Every structure is written in structure tokens, then in C-alpha cells.
Design a protein with these regions (language model features):
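Glycine-rich, acidic and aromatic/proline-enriched surface loops and short helix-turn segments
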Residues: 40-56, 90, 154, 160-167, ...
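Small-residue-rich helix-interface/hinge motifs
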Residues: 94, 101-108
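Extracytoplasmic
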Residues: 43-45, 65-67, 71-76, 92, ...
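Bacterial Sec-dependent N-terminal signal peptides
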Residues: 1-28
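Beta-lactamase-like hydrolase cores
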Residues: 23-66, 71
């Protein structure tokens, strides 16, 4: 539960950050009072970072944790979408992947094999249908983005992880799980930097790909 909550926060960072404009001198404000939001959810450990580029203020709860690398989990759909569009795996955000008719169960982001005990696993009904990229992005459909990663392939994915300098840049042996199983790690601070570059179309992707992804993010 902790990790899920942490990455919901990072997703919030992403959504907020894209509305920013360029900044020069950054003021840092720490907000211990934001602990109540975590306590309300029964979370004993978490962090929050809100960067207001217009006012040039970085607002933190648990600043130390915001600098700690962790699995990007669902937030990796931003990068995954950019690579898919840039490599023509997806021509646009309307690219549909057909549902194979088999509900997928996950535990801590890892797919449970067919026939295995699913008591502690979860299944999201919104994932169990044909989805376009924009629809999959909105509901954070893990099966869709796992298939996208398989189609991209390890070599191409690694090339873009390196060019963007995304976290520790590690894929490991599983092209469809590395952002879920702690192989790839990135800090919330790094995520904010990534979102600033995306907002200004400064990532090593075409302007078209970056604008399509920003448009999908506005659905969140």
C-alpha cells in the first residue's frame, strides 16, 4: 500500500508540473503539516513534492524521501508512451490493443500466473477490454503498457532510457516488468525534472510525441 500511495503522489507531481513555466531561483518550502494526508490513509511512510514554477517554489513533505530512488510503477506510462510514439510502435494515442479475453491478476505490480492463487492479488475491470493508448493511460492499464514495452523491445527502450538519463536506466531481464519490480528506479525529484523538460518539449523526442503525451496527461 505504501508504494502505491507514493506513486500516486508522483503521478500528481507529473500532472501538476506540466502546467509550469521556466524558473530561475528556486525557493524550498517544507510542509510537515501534510503528514495528516498520509495519516488519514493509514500510511506510515510517504512523500509529496509540488513544484510551482510560476512562483519558483518547490514544496515538499518528507524532502529526504523525495530524493530517494524508487520504482516508477504506474508513472512509467509517461515514458513508455513517448517511446512508443517516437519508435512508431504507436502511430498516435488512438492505437488499440485488443483484449485477449483473460483477466489479469497482479500482486505488487507483478502478474500472477494463470491457475495460481489470486487471493492477495487484484484485477481492474477497466483493463479487461480493448483499449486505445489514451484510454489505457487514463486507467493506468498495466497489461496494455506491458504489451507496448514488448513491442518496443529492450534495445530501443534502453536507448531512450540512456538518452533521457531516466533514473538508474536499468531494464534487467524482463522487458515487461522492469518498471514494476524495482529494477528501474527514479526519485520524485528526478521525476519533476523530467516533467519540466516534457512541458518545454526539451526531451529527446519529437515535439509531436511530447504534445500527444501531454494531452493524455490532461485527462488525469
Amino acid at each position: 500500500m505504501r508504494n502505491i500511495f507514493n506513486f500516486l503522489i508522483v503521478a500528481t507531481i507529473a500532472a501538476i508540473s506540466i502546467f509550469s513555466t521556466s524558473c530561475r531561483n528556486i525557493r524550498i518550502d517544507e510542509h510537515s503539516e501534510w503528514a495528516s494526508a498520509f495519516e488519514h490513509e493509514g500510511i506510515t511512510e510517504g512523500c509529496f513534492e509540488y513544484y510551482d514554477n510560476n512562483k519558483e517554489i518547490a514544496n515538499y513533505y518528507n524532502k529526504e524521501m523525495c530524493a530517494t530512488p524508487m520504482s516508477p510503477a504506474s508513472t512509467f506510462k509517461i515514458f513508455n508512451s513517448l517511446v512508443a510514439l517516437e519508435s512508431n510502435v504507436a502511430l498516435d494515442e488512438q492505437m488499440v490493443i485488443k483484449y485477449d479475453g483473460k483477466p489479469k491478476y497482479y500482486n505488487k505490480g507483478i502478474l500472477i500466473p494463470e491457475g495460481a492463487d489470486t487471493t492477495a492479488a487484484f484485477n481492474i475491470p477497466e483493463w479487461n477490454k480493448d483499449l486505445s493508448m489514451s484510454e489505457a493511460f487514463k486507467v493506468s492499464a498495466v497489461p496494455y503498457y506491458q504489451e507496448i514495452a514488448r513491442r518496443i523491445g529492450k534495445e530501443t527502450m534502453q536507448k531512450y532510457l540512456d538518452s533521457v538519463q531516466y533514473g538508474n536506466r536499468r531494464i534487467g531481464t524482463e522487458i515487461d516488468h522492469f518498471w514494476l519490480n524495482d529494477t528501474l528506479k527514479i526519485s520524485p525529484d528526478e521525476q519533476v525534472g523530467l516533467m519540466k523538460r516534457l512541458y518545454h518539449d526539451q526531451l529527446p523526442f519529437s515535439t509531436r510525441a511530447q504534445r500527444i503525451v501531454k494531452g493524455m496527461m490532461l485527462q488525469e
